[in-house]
Amino acid sequence: YVNYGCSTRKSLYQLVDFFSLFYFRFLRDSSFRNLLYWSKLQRTPRFYAWAGVSFEILAMNHIDQVKQRLGISGVSPQLYSWRSKSDAGAAERAAQIDMVIERGDNTINLCEMKFSESEFAINKDYEKILRNKIVRFMEETKTRKSIQLTFISSYGLQRNMYSGIAQNEVVLNDLF
C-alpha cells in the first residue's frame, strides 16, 4: 500500500494471502502431537492478533463493497495506508491509520478496522487514541480536506457516549 503523502518508495508491504498468513502464524513451528492444540489456541492473544490482521486484509480485499456501503463508488477514491512520523520522545503520540480513502469530493475517510466477536465498544481511552490518530494525520499531512472516521468491524459499534466519534460504519455483512 502506498503511504499517504509519500512516494511509492515508502510503500507498505503486507502479506495478504490468507493461507500463508495462517501457515506462518500457526503451522510452521507447531507440533500436531498435542490433540488439544487447536482448542487451546482459541481466545489467545496470538489468535486475536491473527484474526485482526486477517479481518483488515478481508476488508481491504472488499474495497468495492466498502465504497458502496459508504455511498462513494462514484467519487473516484484513492486508497492509502498511513503511519505517523513519530519522533523518539513522542511514542505515545504515534499513530497508524489502517486504510485512508481519499475521495474526489474533498473528503478523506480514515478507516479504523477491528475484529471482535460482538459489537465493539469504544471507551474513553480508545476514543482518545482515535482522536490522536485524526489530529496526527491532519497535522502531518497538512490536509485541508474534510475528515470522516469510518469504523469497519465484524459486528458494528456498541452505541455509547463515545461511539459518536465514528461518522460512518461498515460491518462484516456489508462486505458480502
Give the residues covered by each predicted segment.
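Beta-hairpin "wing" of winged helix-turn-helix
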Residues: 1-3
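A cross-kingdom feature that marks ATP-driven nucleic-acid transaction machinery
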Residues: 5-176
